[in-house]
Amino acid sequence: MTVVTMKQLLEAGVHFGHQTRRWDPKMAPYIFTQRNGIYIIDLQKTIKMLDDAYNYVKAVAQDGGVFLFVGTKKQAQDAVKEEATRAGQYYVNQRWLGGTLTNWTTIQSRVKRLKELKQMSEDGTFDVLPKKEVALLTKEMEKLERFLGGIEDMPRIPDVMFVVDPKKEKIAVHEANILGIPVVAMVDTNTDPDPIDVVIPANDDAIRAIRLISGAMADAIIEGKQGQDDSEDVEKEMADKAAAEDDEEESIEVVVEKSED
């Protein structure tokens, strides 16, 4: 069963690429035709590659993987935040701060500062400070929240990064490549697909297209996590059963020993 239907892809405008004069030749295998100076993406390939991406993401989620959604362009900001949050994962939907992954220790110190400021705001510390100081601290907190709020609780460097428009997010993609973090991405006709590990050929400018693909990735994570929970339940049942059998064997041995006495 396919993750999304051809009808859904068409209605969301996933097939519309960029103008033919703005293209990357490496995307040629994913282009169906051109119409009125616009490349049309081959949706048969999109369906197949989206299915592959879904299964890959689901498998990583089932192993307890951590995911980072990245999309800072205006069209992507809401979908990236909402779908990452729905899947219980993390996101960057404002400016990507250089070193977010490659300088994780420094970023963690800024996250710690954000948490400190939030605590001060909540525990009444701001109420006893001068108004001017509170204004400065509030401004600092809001700035940190804007850029780091989506990764505030991320426990470690992600296992997989999902990207909307890797051409725009080239710094994020480069950092992931350096660290060997697999990148799953919506790749439009104007983008080099080589730095991407799992390519989803798609219009990365249309809000509906972004929401559809981001939603599919969130669904994959949720399904994978459900599978993880199920497997943990099975493992627990098997462990409990094994323990019960051990207890039963011990009881039998005791009975046998007593009968021999």
UniProtKB/Swiss-Prot annotation:
A single Gene Ontology CC term: cytosolic small ribosomal subunit
A Pfam family per the record: Ribosomal_S2
Residue runs in coiled coils: none
The keyword Ribosomal protein is annotated on this UniProt entry: yes
Stored InterPro entries: Ribosomal_uS2, Ribosomal_uS2_bac/mit/plastid, Ribosomal_uS2_CS, Ribosomal_uS2_flav_dom_sf
Region (Disordered): 223-261
Protein name in the entry: Small ribosomal subunit protein uS2
Native species: Lactobacillus johnsonii (strain CNCM I-12250 / La1 / NCC 533)
